[in-house]
Amino acid sequence: MTLQDYIERATNGVDLSHETSRKAAKLLFEDATEAQIGALLTALRAKGETETEIAGFARGMRDAARTITPDRTPLVDTCGTGGDDYDTINISTTSAIVAAGAGAAVAKHGNYSVSSLSGSADVLSVAGADVKAEPPAVEAAIERDGIGFMLAPVFHPAMKAVIGPRKELGMRTIFNILGPLTNPAGADAQVIGVYDPDLVPVLGRALTQLPVERALVVHGSGMDEIALHDTTTVAEVIGDNVDGYTLSASSIGLDSAPVEAVAGGTPEENAADLRGIVTGETTGPKRDIILANAGAAIYVAGLADDIETGVEQAATAIDTGDAKATFETLCEPNSASTEQK
């Protein structure tokens, strides 16, 4: 089948199979004109992307990616779709560092900001990390240090083909939700935040068609994170099973707090918050929201029996200095090596 055939099917409201979606993604990256790319993305958006199409496109993106295979298992990622209603501190990034400090092997996938003031690459770059590290260096870092950062444009060069059409369309497309599903290290334990509560069960079901063993897909009342200000909708994925539930701050041993209490700012301001949290200098809601999300990552890594226990282990990682040591290894390697001597 040609790309035109896929466009016609989607335009006529016909859902694409997993393998057809995978092949369509391959054609978008290799042979499509900008008009064809825009036509298929628009047709899928108008029809409504199914979990099977999402999983198939994710497979296609993985096929085109520069991948790594760190000798650590399970591999954890904390990556959200972005595009939520709030500009907060960098929650998933800070949570990844704390989870690694607690013993999880973290393959953090991220990018520069698109919709917010500060994306994961923005804040880590300001903090001193080499966010443009090549795949072999990231693989070695994960094996050696238990954490590495994979910048999306470095690991997904094929995405250049769709940048122009996506900008011209000016609307959300299937690519807005694929980032967390296309970890180049093949992370098999994930905490995925989504901007729309309706996507929680959809991505949960999509993950059962991908090589992910355990995951939490979360939406925190307007946030693509586990929230403190209100309930969080969760789809928990274990193998082929998806269970849905809600949780609150109190259900995982934390105090509720207004969303304004975790507001972020510029990359420089968010980097200061990140440093303050991992060193234990920052307390209150900003620390607590990191504990919530790091606790979830520790849980999916199999290091805790439930999220509340994961929260306790995240707090211990901060209080013992393990999170700080991980931060220094990732973001301030000269400082870390000096302290070790």
UniProtKB/Swiss-Prot annotation:
Pathway: Amino-acid biosynthesis; L-tryptophan biosynthesis; L-tryptophan from chorismate: step 2/5. InterPro entries: Anthranilate_Pribosyl_Tfrase, Glycosyl_Trfase_fam3, Glycosyl_Trfase_fam3_N_dom, Glycosyl_Trfase_fam3_N_dom_sf, Nuc_phospho_transferase. Anthranilate 2 binds at R166. 5-phospho-alpha-D-ribose 1-diphosphate binds at residues 80, 83-84, 88, 90-93, 108-116, 120. Its EC number is 2.4.2.18. The keyword RNA-binding does not apply. GO terms for biological process: L-tryptophan biosynthetic process. It comes from the Archaea. Mg(2+) 1 binds at S92, E225. Keywords: Amino-acid biosynthesis, Aromatic amino acid biosynthesis, Glycosyltransferase, Magnesium, Metal-binding, Transferase, Tryptophan biosynthesis. The keyword Transmembrane does not apply. Binds 2 magnesium ions per monomer. It is an enzyme of class 2 (transferase). Anthranilate 1 binds at G80, N111. GO terms for cellular component: cytosol. It catalyses: N-(5-phospho-beta-D-ribosyl)anthranilate + diphosphate = 5-phospho-alpha-D-ribose 1-diphosphate + anthranilate. Its cofactor is Mg(2+). Mg(2+) 2 binds at D224, E225. GO terms for molecular function: anthranilate phosphoribosyltransferase activity; magnesium ion binding. Belongs to the anthranilate phosphoribosyltransferase family. Catalyzes the transfer of the phosphoribosyl group of 5-phosphorylribose-1-pyrophosphate (PRPP) to anthranilate to yield N-(5'-phosphoribosyl)-anthranilate (PRA). NCBIfam families: trpD (TIGR01245). Homodimer. This is Anthranilate phosphoribosyltransferase. It comes from Haloquadratum walsbyi (strain DSM 16790 / HBSQ001).
